[in-house]
């Protein structure tokens, strides 16, 4: 039997600063005997910083969920599924979290991106951003940021650049790398293939790989004898 992620309300109060837009937190539980639609629960729509932190601090972090479960936080009015109009032509920036990594890594990535998203750190490109998904799985989890138009390379690359900056800053604070690479995939390709078989449209590395310099050719010719 799946447990709901909501814990008993705490006593910590948070300042109420209004957000520029409302966001809805969704939870997909691990009851595999039910349909996907039956498993998906609307947890809460929040419209202020205080409401966000009150919710964030009162439920389990992603690492505390039973696999296979999902957390989704999307702009209010957008459901966390490929089929809705805002998502059907979109794509995602994907971060893969290998099974051997510590649980805190996933929780940190999730919270850092959430704060950037609701805090409008993506500037005008926030209009191209639909939400964030955390897929908790036993063999390795994923966190992805969904955008509404996979063909809008400019907006998608700028969003990826902000994600890199946010996560690299957090990596320095936590004194350990949080990710290796951000991969951008379109939803249509993901539906047709497994994630490992999807070719990324874009890739952004935490540390850009160094270009291997071609070795300087060594001449095997015998130098000419200088004239006397």
Swiss-Prot record:
GO biological process: determination of adult lifespan; embryo development ending in birth or egg hatching; negative regulation of response to oxidative stress; positive regulation of translation; translational initiation
Molecular function via GO: RNA 7-methylguanosine cap binding; RNA trimethylguanosine cap binding; translation initiation factor activity
Disulfide bonds: 130-134
Tissue specificity annotation: Highly expressed in all somatic tissues.
Entry superkingdom: Eukaryota
Keywords associated with the record: Disulfide bond, Initiation factor, Protein biosynthesis, RNA-binding, Translation regulation
The keyword Membrane is assigned to this record: no
GO cellular component: cytoplasmic stress granule; eukaryotic translation initiation factor 4F complex
Record InterPro entries: TIF_eIF4e-like (IPR023398), TIF_eIF_4E (IPR001040), TIF_eIF_4E_CS (IPR019770)
Knocked-out gene: effects: RNAi-mediated knockdown increases lifespan. Lifespan is further increased in an age-1 hx546, daf-2 e1370, clk-1 qm30 or eat-2 ad465 mutant background.
PROSITE patterns listed in its UniProt record: IF4E
Record Pfam families: IF4E
Subunit structure: eIF4F is a multi-subunit complex, the composition of which varies with external and internal environmental conditions. It is composed of at least eIF4A, eIF4E and eIF4G. eIF4E is also known to interact with other partners.
The protein's role, per its UniProt record: Recognizes and binds the 7-methylguanosine-containing mRNA cap during an early step in the initiation of protein synthesis and facilitates ribosome binding by inducing the unwinding of the mRNAs secondary structures. All 5 eIF4E proteins bind monomethyl cap structures. Only ife-1, ife-2 and ife-5 bind trimethyl cap structures which result from trans-splicing. Translation of trimethyl cap structure mRNAs may be regulated by intracellular redox state; disulfide bonds change the width and depth of the cap-binding cavity determining selectivity to mRNA caps.
UniProt family annotation: Belongs to the eukaryotic initiation factor 4E family.
PANTHER family, sorted: EUKARYOTIC TRANSLATION INITIATION FACTOR 4E RELATED, EUKARYOTIC TRANSLATION INITIATION FACTOR 4E-2
Protein name: Eukaryotic translation initiation factor 4E-2
